[in-house]
Amino acid sequence: GEKMQKIRLAAMRLKIRIRPVEKAEYAQTIAALCGAEDAREAAYTGAGFEDEMLVMANFPAGMMNTFLGLFRRMGIAPVALKAMLTPTNAAWDSEKLHEELAGEHRAMTNGEGKRHQG
């Protein structure tokens, strides 16, 4: 949609390659989806999820902040579930990464709510 087009434009400005992931690819490891290893023969049969996720891989120092700052300047709504490729999450599939990021996001959101209540 429109948000994806804006994200592509932001990425092009910084010479970042964007790769959308289709539901059929959710069984692949995050490393394979990021091009860090070969894809495996694996069919995804799960229910999937609707939340958008953003995984950043091979970003030089400071690039993530520059990229996300460009989101703000271009009026692109934040992506709540985002991660850098790490040795830990590289072996996960999309569903496992989604589960972990959604849990972290809920914990942060709940934590902020509690802090404001006093």
Where are these regions (language model features)?
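N-terminal, charge-rich interaction modules
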Residues: G1-A36
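Surface-exposed interaction/gating patches
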Residues: G1-I7, M108-G113, Q117
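Gly/Ser/Thr-rich loops at beta-strand to alpha-helix junctions
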Residues: G1-K3, P60-M63, T88-W92
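Residue-level signal for secondary-structure boundary elements
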Residues: R19, V79, H105-T109, G113
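Basic helix-extension-helix modules of the SAP/HeH family
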Residues: A31, A57, L97-E100
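A polyampholytic, Gly/Pro-enriched intrinsically disordered region
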Residues: D38-G46, E99-G111
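Mid-chain, well-packed structural core segment of small domains
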Residues: A43-M74
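Ser/Thr/Gly-rich flexible loops in soluble cytosolic domains mediating phosphotransfer, phosphorylation
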Residues: L68-E104
